Amino acid sequence: MKYQVKQVAEISGVSIRTLHHYDNIELLNPSALTDAGYRLYSDADLERLQQILFFKEIGFRLDEIKEMLDHPNFDRKAALQSQKEILMKKKQRMDEMIQTIDRTLLSVDGGETMNKRDLFAGLSMKDIEEHQQTYADEVRKLYGKEIAEETEKRTSAYSADDWRTIMAEFDSIYRRIAARMKHGPDDAEIQAAVGAFRDHICQYHYDCTLDIFRGLGEVYITDERFTDSINQYGEGLAAFLREAIIIYCDHQENPRP
């Protein structure tokens, strides 16, 4: 079925002007044009628009979304699962913040005095700071002071919501890999997840070349801090991830015909 731009706008809630913009930047091109030059969108185009809107909601820029959707390893089902997990974590945090506001209002109205820790439920930056420090340590170990400083400069610009999105996506990728360990490191879905992991690093932290990615896999089994952290997602995951990274890099360097 084909849809005119006005119909797509009505179905999706995205303005006609925005749809025109997405076409102009080649983020969402209509699959066909009428003889008069009017845009016609297919069901597949609508599915791509859905992905665009989900990625926007969790904080990605349009250029980043285009790069992900156009990536040969893009997996729509896996992306939807990751997006759901990220949005669930955001919902959980928002629910905690709403509860904190409600308890604070009761306290203001003369109810019980709130525990000081409860004042900040849903607002803590502790997990975010620990995640940021982990990446700083990882980069410093792999590439030295200069690149580490550049990475820290880049990540220091992230807001609390940025970091929560990054952490949720990171967590989702690890869980995705851990859930399929029994299929072996060369499993197609495992390899797609490893590709998503590398993309995640490139997007948020540093340019993860294949050589760097291989080195990262080695760090995961030689540094107990990283080994222990990764293995929380599944026994032996660190070593498994290293093997999966090696296979991924080999395939990238010597693509199968």
Curated annotation (Swiss-Prot):
Residues 5-24 bind DNA. Its main location: cytoplasm. One of its GO terms (biological process) is regulation of DNA-templated transcription. Residues 2-71 form the HTH merR-type domain. One of its GO terms (molecular function) is DNA binding. GO terms for cellular component: cytoplasm. Keywords: Activator, Coiled coil, Cytoplasm, DNA-binding, Transcription, Transcription regulation. Pfam families: MerR_1 (PF13411), TipAS (PF07739). Residues 76-104 are annotated as: Essential for dimerization. Residues 71-74 are annotated as: Hinge. PANTHER family: HTH-TYPE TRANSCRIPTIONAL ACTIVATOR MTA, REDOX-CYCLING DRUG-SENSING TRANSCRIPTIONAL ACTIVATOR SOXR. The central dimerization domain of the first subunit forms a two-helix antiparallel coiled coil with the dimerization domain of the second subunit. This is HTH-type transcriptional activator mta. It comes from Bacillus subtilis (strain 168).
